[in-house]
Design a protein with these regions (language model features):
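Cleavable N-terminal signal peptides of Sec/SRP-targeted secreted and luminal proteins
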Residues: 1-17
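Low-complexity, Pro/Ser/Thr-rich intrinsically disordered segments
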Residues: 14-22, 476-497
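Active-site mouth of glycoside hydrolases
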Residues: 22-315, 326-350, 356-468
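Generic signature of intrinsically disordered, low-complexity, basic-rich segments
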Residues: 11-15, 453-460, 485-488
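Residue-level marker of intrinsically disordered, low-complexity segments enriched
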Residues: 3, 14, 29-31, 444, ...
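General helical secondary-structure elements
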Residues: 9, 13, 83, 99, ...
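Core catalytic subdomain of AMP-forming adenylate-forming
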Residues: 467-478
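Acidic, serine/threonine/proline-rich low-complexity intrinsically disordered regions
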Residues: 317-320
């Protein structure tokens, strides 16, 4: 009897010690870069990515506006077509003074340093689910645009003023019942004489340009970075900084004209906290060679990225049913891919096309009465132009990859999955469509039944065949070259001011 009790106590003690034992980090489990190529294990790795930005909310409890069963269904769908990476938001900000329009709700950060644990648990669940399917994750830590709160909310906090000069954004109550864009506000223009932006871009840019508040905005931002990276997943028990499911920490979604000193300070800070993860900027690459190389030049930035938006930038008209506009879009995309390939080769870093998209055949919805008596972005429109554009773009990137010309993956915007524009919004007014709250729902969505997904799947297959053809046979032990990693100092200050 005494022996049995002793054995039971010993077993309990061992169980407690095992549960308290820190998670063992194996650097070989992380995606890394060697000779300007992504690697996973012993092989080159091509990113078949997908933008799926709202998953920390989608995977949250129903009471927090989530839909976990939908999320799990969609992750399974993504895996089935060969997606091996997703880009998501790991940040969203509320005003702390009531609900602001055009953004994600509930927010992860309700006010500086105050977090909604339900949304954090949604992020925990998302990482665990992606891990089951061997899907790696790009964690975006901030946003120049307002649909997640982002820079403008940091500026609002720092100035103690909730009046944000929003640009034209989607108003679901306009043109009932279809919705329309607001007409007030401005995205802003660049004033060459003052060397500053006007409108919303100028306001949001104060996040890292206004020296009267950057000690606050950057301080809060670095606190957020530290909180997220050091978080221990409530489901897996693994700290985010030790989780190989996370491939990359991305500084921000589409920072406009970011100071090099801000990029360097922030990326080095991330590296000091999560040395096994990659870091990138989230830059579009639309402003030319000088900006592209400058933004991606710091040693603490592992790879470059590009965002390609032919309609938003005036190179495609979704109401044109002829080939003229589509050909124009392809010609612009050709030059964009060529330029970023050359610039990335110059700085010896891989590049990923982490955002691009095209609308459905909207001329069909106009014929049905849009925008007055039919929804312009209705899912009933076909995707003939979109499919041709995706086929052209993805095959081009795969060809660059095959020839060692820097491009190493694509990430369409964005996965809407089983959602459709006719679905009702949740109790928080959110659709969790592929399009964020400030844009027309359904504009750039990829639905689970779209033929476009077959093109994404073909890309995955073609890239895999290239890797098989160029990789040595077998999987020899120790095939990975040891990484020479710089140790970045953990700086709590703001040195870029």
């Amino acid at each position: 009897m005494i022996l049995s009790v002793c054995l039971l106590l010993l077993s309990l003690q061992q169980s407690i010690q095992a549960s308290q034992k820190p998670h063992q980090v194996n650097p070989d489990h992380f995606i890394y870069i060697e000779n300007a190529l992504f690697h996973r294990g012993c092989e080159p790795h091509y990113l078949v990515s997908m933008n799926y930005w709202g998953v920390m909310n989608l995977a949250a409890d129903d009471s927090a506006g989530g839909n976990l069963s939908r999320f799990k269904t969609e992750v399974k769908q993504l895996s089935a077509i060969g997606v091996n990476n997703v880009r998501i938001m790991a940040a969203s900000e509320a005003s702390g003074r009531g609900t602001q329009p055009f953004r994600m709700y509930p927010a992860l950060m309700e006010s500086p340093g105050k977090y909604n644990e339900q949304i954090f648990i949604g992020l925990d669940r998302a990482l665990v689910e992606f891990s089951k399917y061997n899907i790696s994750v790009v964690m975006t830590l901030n946003n120049f645009w307002h649909w997640s709160g982002g820079y403008s909310q940091y500026v609002s906090w720092a100035t103690n003023n909730s009046d944000i000069p929003y640009p034209p954004s989607w108003d679901p109550e306009a043109n009932p019942p279809y919705g329309d864009y607001t007409t007030n506000g401005s995205w802003g223009n660049y004033n060459a004489s003052t060397q500053a932006w006007t409108g919303f871009t100028g306001y949001a840019g104060r996040f890292y340009n206004d020296t009267s508040i950057t000690h606050l905005t950057q301080g809060w931002f670095k606190d957020h970075i530290k909180t997220v990276i050091n978080r221990v997943n409530t489901i897996s028990g693994v700290a985010y900084k030790d989780d190989p499911t996370i491939m990359t920490w991305e500084l921000s979604n589409e920072p406009q004209d970011p100071p090099l000193s801000w990029i360097t300070e922030t990326s080095e800070y991330i590296k000091s906290l999560a040395p096994n993860h990659l870091v990138t900027v989230g830059f579009e690459g639309k402003t030319g060679e000088w900006w592209f190389k400058r933004v991606h030049s710091p040693e603490s930035i592992d790879y470059a990225c590009g965002h390609l938006w032919v309609q938003n930038w005036g190179h495609y008209d979704p109401l044109d049913s002829t080939d003229k506009s589509l050909i124009q879009a392809e010609e612009f995309a050709t030059g964009f891919l060529k330029n970023l390939s050359a610039w990335s080769l110059d700085i010896h870093k891989p590049v990923v096309l982490e955002e691009f998209g095209m609308a459905r055949d909207e001329w069909q919805n106009v014929a049905k009465g849009a925008p007055k008596s039919f929804y312009l972005y209705d899912a009933s429109a076909t995707t003939t132009h979109k499919d041709r554009y995706f086929q052209f773009l993805l095959s081009s990137v795969v060809e660059y990859f095959k020839n060692g010309k820097a491009w190493q993956g694509t990430g369409p915007w964005a996965y809407g999955g089983i959602w459709r524009p006719t679905d009702k919004k949740n109790a928080f007014g959110q659709a969790w469509a592929g399009d964020p709250p400030h844009e027309a729902p359904g504009w750039y969505d990829l639905y689970d039944t779209d033929p476009t997904l077959k093109i994404v799947a073909a890309q995955a297959h073609n890239a895999s065949e290239i890797i098989k053809a160029t990789s040595p046979p077998g999987n020899p032990s120790g095939c990975r070259s040891p990484r020479s990693k710089k140790v970045f100092a953990n700086s709590a200050g703001s040195s870029y001011l």
